[in-house]
Design a protein with these regions (language model features):
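A short, gly/pro- and small-residue-rich
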Residues: 154-175, 279-282, 334-349
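A glycine-rich, hydrophobic/aromatic-adjacent loop/helix-cap motif
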Residues: 253-320
Length: 381
């Protein structure tokens, strides 16, 4: 962070950071705007009637005393809905809820849902025994099969994967890397791929199994259990990918020195998402791909099911106090879930938003938190 007279003026990448290597994505570059945004809430506010849009400023002592009193009620009726804020804050809230006997915090973020983080973590847990987000080293591979992972746009860490894509194309293994993208739509990643395979949504797992089975046969090895139950004719019919194309892709994967298969995004967001993720991850075991490795163990990625359960508890009146931090559920959640209507059955709603977003305007209190440039914590890597 470049500062002048104690004021942040620009954010740049750290050349020594293993992820960005001195670069930064547009979202990071513009984050300084949140610090000086004229609409930023400067002090705690109390609603003059929920939903009225009218608030009065209150002292921090009164705000903190109110929050403390709200936590003193029946712990079973206290709920925390968090976004994808830094891990230190999630860990702190998790410890607080455990100590007071309240339900564990629910985590949600629209972007995380689009990325299918929870599905990928669960597939990794069932495949490797460790719940964590895998990192895929594109730069160390020579052939990459991307199933729905639009890593050149917003998927997980677009900056790190863009750098990896550049290394893939430069040919670390002596030849230019080859990219095949399996997506129903032609995203940015599919647009620059050597081959774009427009599969029928929900059939990505069958395609991965077909490629795995055929690649194992080409290599002359035993067919792994993950691919043993495949019906090739069924895979062709349900995926829309011809048998000839599947044989071509299997040969490409089998002959690669360091192939890599990446599950994510759209492939995991459709029906059979978990099964597809497991089948795609299993492709990496065919030749012992070293280009995929696990980040720190992490089970904190929220699922839509946990949010639905929370909304149902709100509707039934089980929740008397709701704390919301780092997420705007009134805007981000599908309207069909009825989150804003469910809020009417909650006695007290506290938002920690720094801006008057849709959820904050329907809350009883707004206790604005620091921005990332004003706080310090940790992130598991």
């Amino acid at each position: 962070v470049r500062a002048r007279e104690g004021r942040a003026i620009k954010i740049e990448g750290n050349p020594q950071h293993p992820v960005n290597r001195g670069k930064l994505c547009p979202r990071g570059l513009t984050s300084v705007q949140g610090l000086y945004n004229p609409d930023r809430i400067q002090a705690p506010r109390k609603a003059a009637g929920r939903g009225s849009g009218n608030f009065i400023d209150i002292p921090w002592d009164e705000a903190l005393s109110t929050a403390s009193n709200l936590l003193g009620g029946d712990p079973a009726g206290v709920a925390f809905l968090l976004g994808y804020q830094p891990d230190h804050l999630y860990d702190l809230v998790k410890e607080i809820t455990a100590a007071m006997g309240a339900p564990a915090p629910v985590r949600y973020g629209a972007l995380g849902m689009f990325e299918a983080r929870a599905t990928l973590i669960e597939a990794t847990r069932q495949t490797t025994g460790t719940a964590g987000l895998p990192f895929f080293d594109l730069g160390s591979a020579d052939v990459v099969f991307s199933f729905g992972a639009n890593f050149l746009e917003t998927w997980l860490s677009p900056l790190a994967y863009s750098r990896g894509y550049g290394n893939l194309r430069q040919g670390k293994l002596g030849k230019r890397g080859y990219l095949v993208s399996f997506e129903a739509r032609q995203s940015v990643t599919s647009g620059v791929a050597d081959e774009w395979i427009p599969v029928i949504p929900g059939s990505e797992g069958l395609v991965a199994k077909a490629i795995g089975r055929l690649a194992a046969q080409i290599n002359g090895g035993t067919i792994p259990t993950a691919f043993a139950d495949l019906d090739l004719a069924q895979a062709v019919q349900q995926s829309g990918v011809s048998e000839e194309k599947l044989h071509h892709l299997a040969e490409l994967f089998a002959q690669a020195q360091q192939p890599l298969a990446i599950p994510g995004g759209a492939a995991l967001g459709h029906v059979n998402g978990l099964a597809s993720a497991k089948a795609i991850l299993a492709l990496n075991a065919l030749k012992g791909a070293a280009s995929a490795w696990l980040a720190a163990e992490d089970d904190s990625a929220g699922s839509l099911a946990s949010v639905v359960a929370l909304v149902n508890r709100m509707k039934s009146g089980e929740i008397h106090t709701l704390f919301i931090h780092g997420v705007n559920p009134v805007f981000e959640l599908p309207a069909a879930l009825g989150f804003s209507d469910a809020m009417k059955n909650v006695k007290a709603v506290v938002s920690f938003s720094s801006f008057p977003d849709e959820t904050a305007l329907l809350s009883d209190w707004i206790l604005p938190d620091h921005t990332g440039l004003e706080s310090f914590g940790y992130q598991r890597v």
